[in-house]
Regions:
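Histidine-anchored nucleotide/phosphate-binding helix
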Residues: 64-80
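Active-site gating/interface segments in enzymes
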Residues: 119-123, 127-136, 204-251
Length: 303
């Protein structure tokens, strides 16, 4: 364990986070020690507890099981960054977590709970900032450009562990679920545990016709082998039916444009990618894409 939080300087906290190997645990894996030293002043810390990806409930479980650690971790971030306020954002389909966290922050003047409407992809950084604070992160910009830092709930819990117990980031809570898993649930797993061992621990598959994804059904990616490790940003494994649907040519219906949370035009990304027109993709602001795959989900051509 390190010194009490009140006795630690901002630089000491950042060094603790760095030595503990803490990264963004919502999937991005960006080093948290870098995020705690923003190039521009920030006034607000958003704790992302939305977990809008279907099937996954790991962050929900962390909110319920480690509420005190989350509050401690948020205090550490506020002290380190000099931000004035911390907001814990939770979707309205988690009433038990909302009630618990509201109790925890009731007597803390610079913390509050924001209840967001359950909507995918609410948890995307830029979407979250716009929804909660009404601020728009510029194209190609970072949350710090509008005075905000966004951290995942599990990341903040890891910060608390590092300061309070000295434990580096060697384990995390992850969801193993899907209709093909015999005994689904949320588990504390060691970083580096193979997907195969994790699925075996859950009793294996219900049958052999299965598609395994690292992450959720929307933003997760299919695995060709189960001999891969769970990483710091691995929030879940799902096992679902295989999808044999074949891709058809784009009919330019525009449904992908309608559902894009970043107000982009995904149909042109497909066109330009096939043409290897990378400048065209850049001109269409492809770097603002948050890879939520709403366009893929809604696409009538199954692109």
């Amino acid at each position: 364990p390190h010194k009490p939080l009140d006795d630690l300087t901002a630089d000491e906290i950042i060094e603790i986070v760095k030595e503990a190997g803490i990264v963004g645990m919502g999937g991005a894996g960006f080093p948290t020690c870098v995020k705690l030293k923003p190039a521009k002043p920030v006034d607000t810390i958003l704790l992302n507890g939305c977990e809008c990806e279907p099937y996954l409930t790991a962050d929900h479980k962390v909110l319920l099981a480690y509420a005190d650690e989350i509050i401690f971790g948020l205090k550490a971030i506020l002290k380190t960054t000099g931000a004035e306020k911390g907001i814990i954002v939770i979707e309205d389909n988690k009433p038990d977590a909302i009630e618990l966290m509201k109790e925890k922050v009731a007597d803390i003047g610079n913390m509050e709970v924001f209840v967001a409407r359950t909507k995918y992809p609410q948890g995307a950084e830029k979407t979250l900032i716009k929804r909660v604070l009404g601020r728009i992160v510029p194209s190609g910009g970072l949350p710090a450009d509008v005075g905000v830092i966004v951290d995942n709930i599990s990341t903040v819990k890891a910060i608390a562990d590092a300061i309070q117990t000295g434990m580096p980031l060697i384990e995390r809570v992850a969801t193993v679920t899907g209709e093909k898993i015999k005994n689904p649930g949320n588990f504390i797993i060691k970083i580096g545990t193979s997907v195969k061992d994790l699925i075996d621990y859950c009793g294996g598959f219900t049958d052999d016709d299965v598609l395994v994804k690292m992450g959720g059904p929307m933003m997760g990616f299919p695995l060709n082998t189960l001999d891969v490790p769970m990483m710091k940003g691995s929030n879940g494994i799902i096992a679902i039916d295989t999808d044999e649907t074949k891709e058809q040519p784009c009919i330019k219906c525009g449904r992908c444009v309608d559902v894009c949370p970043m107000e982009l035009s995904p149909l042109y990304f497909v066109k330009y990618a096939k043409e290897e027109n990378w400048q065209g993709m850049k001109d269409m602001n492809v770097m603002d894409c948050v890879e939520c795959r709403c366009c893929q989900y809604i696409c009538s051509s199954k692109i």
